[in-house]
Regions:
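Sec-dependent N-terminal signal peptides
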Residues: 4-14
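Secretory-pathway ectodomains
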Residues: 18-488
Length: 488
């Protein structure tokens, strides 16, 4: 197969229209700088700093909320309780979710043993800059203190339901017959009051079913059902998927995993009323084990949510990829095995798949080439393109985002050898012409470490962490770099 070199090379110094500095000399200690989303669209960013702990063990955090253009929306302080006065006990940020003008901050107390307890929340209205409510997730815990330290075995996961509030998924593994598996799934409003609660009617022989939240938005909730038996939390397997209505909690789709092969699903997404799942598949054995280097092809399974039925199931052996030298176990000649990083559905119903090849050496991988696969509406191969990129010890793909005016999609990945020799690569795929154009940006900076993150449409975020923070005066610089793309 003919190898394709990079079609467009951009070598430039950074020039940014919008930026935000995280000041080293500012009060408190830097905790995080995170993007937050409205469904799948970037809405803004929030910086969090830990300020101080008073004599009553109240830990004060300062927040600064920015919009997607890095303009300040609001700022203020929130407080969280520390369980004891031990220096080893820390209050840490666990997650941030945004829904309908509200930011919900989740915190844990972490102890010297590494255990997490006392998951608590604070909800902020970013329009009025007021704290709406605060509380502890587990209602059995009346206060964050030593007295209740060992009372909770539940794990709580929070997700945004957009305009419909927040989803709380409480899961507890088996401890004894008196304390069995437990799973509570419910939606809450701005006052943290329950809107609806979901109770599953599905059983799996003599096992317990616990659900993992995979994706949520204004319309749907996608959950993965795991079957457990006994008190061994490693002895479980994925048995089915369900889709719920975000507004009511009603089950819309029940999808069982095919027993024909062993599946490793790399992606799950809902688009246009269809659930898409896919990844590698393996020959079935009695113990449901598999060799990660012995897959036999790619699978894509599609379910129709409205009709609650299977729409399509495609099994694609590797030998069907005619324009790449690949054996029946997914090994590309001279380049190694394939790992599939991203599968996107194009507006015309076709698919764009991004993959990287790698060699497995002991416990580490060396990543070699980059591949793109064009697939038709039934997930059959149309065209494969191979790109020459640097070998790296880690994978290169980072994230993707839409190009302006829905003209295509940009895929971002690093070729990294060391901090002084970075390459930011941006692969633009255009829907109308089906053209692929790669930009290569060399990044050389002796004074800082660089990473990238999602930004508003048409831009990429650059985070620059300064090595000599005292000299620079800043801890880090967050900036937006405008993308070069074609207008079709």
């Amino acid at each position: 197969m003919k190898k394709i070199i990079f079609l467009f090379i951009l070598i430039t110094q950074f020039s940014f229209g919008q930026s935000y500095s995280v000041l080293k000399q500012a009060d408190g200690d830097f905790v995080s700088f995170d993007p937050f989303y409205e469904n799948t669209d970037l809405f803004g960013y929030v910086e969090l700093r830990e300020m101080n702990t008073d004599e009553n063990l109240n830990v004060t955090f300062k927040y600064i909320v920015l919009d997607k253009n890095m303009n300040k929306i609001c700022s203020g302080e929130i407080k969280q309780k520390k369980a004891d006065d031990a220096k080893s006990t820390k209050v840490i940020l666990d997650d941030i979710n945004y829904a309908n003008g509200l930011l919900r901050f989740d915190f844990y107390n972490v102890f010297i043993s590494g255990s997490r307890n006392f998951k608590a929340y604070t909800t902020l209205n970013i329009t009025t800059n007021t704290i709406v409510n605060t509380g502890i997730y587990n209602p059995e815990i009346k206060a964050i203190s030593k007295e209740y330290k060992n009372n909770s075995r539940s794990l709580f996961n929070t997700s945004s339901l957009g305009k419909n509030g927040f989803l709380i998924n409480e899961r507890r593994l088996f401890a004894s017959n008196k304390d069995p598996f437990y799973n509570k799934i419910h939606a809450v409003d701005t006052k943290n009051e329950t809107i609806w609660e979901f109770t599953s009617s599905h059983v799996f022989k003599d096992k317990y079913i616990l659900y993992k939240t995979l994706a949520t938005d204004d319309n749907y909730i996608l959950m993965e059902g795991h079957a457990y038996k006994g008190n061994n939390d490693n002895n479980h397997k994925i048995v089915h998927y369900i889709v719920l209505d975000s507004k009511t909690g009603k089950e819309l789709l029940f999808a069982e995993v095919s027993e024909k092969y062993t599946h490793i699903f790399d992606y799950h997404f809902i688009q246009n009323g269809l659930l898409y799942m896919g990844g590698k598949y393996y020959e079935k054995n009695k113990n449901n084990n598999y060799n990660s280097l012995a897959s036999i092809g790619l699978n894509q399974t599609v379910f129709d949510i409205k009709s609650n039925s299977l729409s399509r199931e495609t099994y694609l052996p590797y030998e069907k990829f005619k324009d790449v030298e690949i054996n029946k176990s997914g090994k590309v000649s001279k380049e190694g095995y394939l790992t599939f990083q991203k599968t996107s559905l194009n507006p015309d119903g076709t698919f764009f798949v991004l993959a990287e090849s790698y060699w497995q050496k002991s416990n580490c991988r060396t990543y070699t080439q980059l591949y793109t696969f064009m697939m038709d509406k039934d997930f059959n191969p149309i065209k494969t393109v191979e790109y020459n990129v640097k070998q790296t010890k880690g994978y290169k793909y980072d994230f993707s985002q839409r190009l302006p005016d829905t003209t295509g999609r940009a895929y971002f990945f690093f070729d990294k050898t060391d901090d002084r020799d970075l390459e930011l690569n941006i692969l633009n795929y255009y829907y109308k012409s089906k053209k692929q154009v790669v930009q290569k940006m060399n990044i050389s900076n002796d004074n800082s470490t660089i990473s990238i993150f999602p930004a508003k449409t048409g831009y990429v975020g650059i985070a620059e962490y300064y090595k000599d923070q005292k000299k620079q005066g800043n801890y880090m610089e967050i900036r937006l770099e405008k993308l070069n793309y074609e207008r079709e």
